[in-house]
Amino acid sequence: IARVLGCKRTVEGGLEGERYVVTWALGHLVELAPPEDYDKAWQKWDMLTLPMLPERMKTVVIPQSGRQFRAVQAQLRRGDVGELVIATDAGREGELVARWILEKAGWKGPARRLWISSQTDKAIREGFTHLRPAAEYDNLFRSARARSEADWLVGLNVTRALTCRHNAQLSAGRVQTPTLALIVEREEAI
């Protein structure tokens, strides 16, 4: 994208051209806060602390991603940046990656969305001629956030309950639990 947009000058955490500054996320830079960020009692794995039901879910910068988050945030805070183009993967997770970064970085300016399924020069150029208001993707972001919050609530609560109840390191999750059930079912059939 940076090459197609003519961004060649290196800046902190990005590349700059005459019209655009391109930066990147390298996957998730922000995630839902761990249990102990809501309540210190939730740091201990104990049946008495379950269920863990935060009144409002919070996000935190992933510690290993802090440097890149700060680089993105620095680009967003530049005085010459008046609009943002979200160019993460076209899909639910890509929307979540971008929106959580923007929320955590405090971006309040206008935003548009690049929605492309190919990284060819032609696709990128065409995509930039058809940018849509980011608000048109709000429901996609909401669905991604709901999925992430549900995974946190079910995964952490059920994992802790199983581990505490059976005194063994066990885990449960939205995808892994039914997948394991299918494997067990298949194994029993053999």
Residue ranges and their predicted role:
Residues 147, 151-190:
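Prokaryote-biased recognition of long, low-complexity C-terminal linker/tail segments
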